[in-house]
Amino acid sequence: MEKSESNSEGLYLQNILNVPPPQRFIVLIILALWIWTWILKFFLHSNLDVSQVILTRVPHDIRPGYTLQQLHRTARNFALKITRIIIPFHFATVFLFEFMNIIEGPLKNIILIVYFLPLIQCVTIFWFLLKECQIIKYCTRRCLLIESSPRSLRNTYILISDTLTSFAKPLIDFTLFTSLIFREPFTHFDLSVALLPVLVRLLQCLREYRLLHEATLLFNALKYSCNLPILFCTWRSRVYEGSINEERLHHVQRWFMLINSSYTLFWDVRMDWSLDSLTSLRSRSKSAVTLKKKMYHSAILVDFLLRFWWLWVYLSQNLKLVAADSDYIFFQGEMQYFEVIRRGIWVVFKLDAEYYIKFASK
């Protein structure tokens, strides 16, 4: 009896975490909205007015920008509104998805509803986002025309564009599933969609280099271009699925992933967070940091662990700690959740670095 109860509890927990792949994309968007709210609350408690380093209104708007308190209140209200709208859709999607898998020969109408529900939620979220946040709408329309001045506007562009890159894998799952509305998934269309955030950020770096002629922008562009071989290997492995070439491609892909993770970790810490020393952190200034030192050290450690999470999964497979065909350690899709959380940590210390550059370093 106790064993049965234990198994049922484990199954219940697994069902909570194992959200259907297309719905996971929606859950991650909601999570990102709440993380942004918590970030603003953190800066409120830390007395760091980061509203001074990001543009909160479109450039031609003559009204003063949002204060940090206003920004936090607006973000919280928006996250609450979207969460309340999505919750009924979420439970309906999960229920119908499970129902579709249980019954034999599911009704065509149920299949169509299951395929459409995540798409409806996605359209709803982005419609409200673009309607109620004019600065996001402005930056989205001009994403390839990134403006380097004022710096606060550039920071807003970068926060939006870099956050989108963290949704590449969820986008693949979402696009694959949604394309089933048309009976069969579009061939490799999901990879094209996942490529868009990377290309946007890559082209932004090249445009900035053409305007400013700063060498670091080329190295930043190189960082984003490291994603291209990884996606190429994914595409080729599909072509050679089931053959010996597939395993060779996976091996090559892991080397590219190792290079990409190492490069991006260095860039996060050294360039984006303006930290040049693990001991003194910002060694060139007496007022080295604006937060507690242990926060920076913890962030670097967490960034390292999450950047290389794919490697921990791979090592766990080789050590037979998880199944050989498993792509997770704790629960399905964990890497996508961890990436959104890692991005939230990156945003905290990116804004901290911008605040330091504008105020503390002077």
Curated annotation (Swiss-Prot):
Cited Pfam families: EXS (PF03124)
Stretches in topological domain Extracellular: 1-24, 106-109
Main location: endoplasmic reticulum
Coiled-coil intervals, chain numbering: none
One GO biological process term: protein glycosylation
One CC-aspect GO term: endoplasmic reticulum membrane
Disulfide bonds: none
Keywords, sorted A to Z: Endoplasmic reticulum, Membrane, Protein transport, Transmembrane, Transmembrane helix, Transport
UniProt domain EXS: residue ranges: 181-362
InterPro entries named among the record's database cross-references: EXS_C (IPR004342)
Topological domain spans for side Cytoplasmic: 46-84, 131-362
Transmembrane portions of the chain: 25-45, 85-105, 110-130
Role of this protein: Required for the retention of luminal endoplasmic reticulum proteins, affects glycoprotein processing in the Golgi apparatus.
UniProt record similarity statement: Belongs to the ERD1 family.
Protein name: Protein ERD1
Lineage: Eukaryota, Fungi, Dikarya, Ascomycota, Saccharomycotina
Gene assigned in the entry: ERD1
